Amino acid sequence: VLELRETIAASDALLVVTPEYNGSLPGQLKNMLDWASRPRVGAVLREKTVAVIGASPSPSGARTAQADARRVLTRAGALVIDSELVVPSAHARLGAGDRLGDEELALAVREVLLELRRAVRPAARDAALASIHRGRPSSGSCTAAPSFRRRTERSPR
């Protein structure tokens, strides 16, 4: 748990990719998010910029699990970007090993990652400026993130 908390604290942003088990996020993921959200003061998820992707062999693409993860992360104080990606029929769309199976999916994942990166940069700048105004060096934590309303959804070919 300490290593998890240190890794999240040292990151600029977090990408959560979740499958869907029985209409919700997996218990292991929920447990990890719970550990990262405590204690409330000093929680490593607080003000961390996060993107969530859902992938499932079902036609829904883990839409419910993705919504649950977004709700839990928001409740923990994370800054969850609005850009979403659900991957229905993931078993047919993922390639062997660490490769994405189709170009359309690869581009959709890249779009989410670019949105995440764009959300982190202004937040880090705002934190640095606020820190300068207070007369102390920046801790690098995020204080704000822009809102992205575009929904990115890909269906199988």
Regions found by a protein language model. Name each.
Residues V1-T7, V109, S155:
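Short intrinsically disordered, low-complexity coil segments enriched in acidic
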Residues L2-A76:
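Helix-loop-strand module that forms the ligand-binding subsite of alpha/beta enzymes
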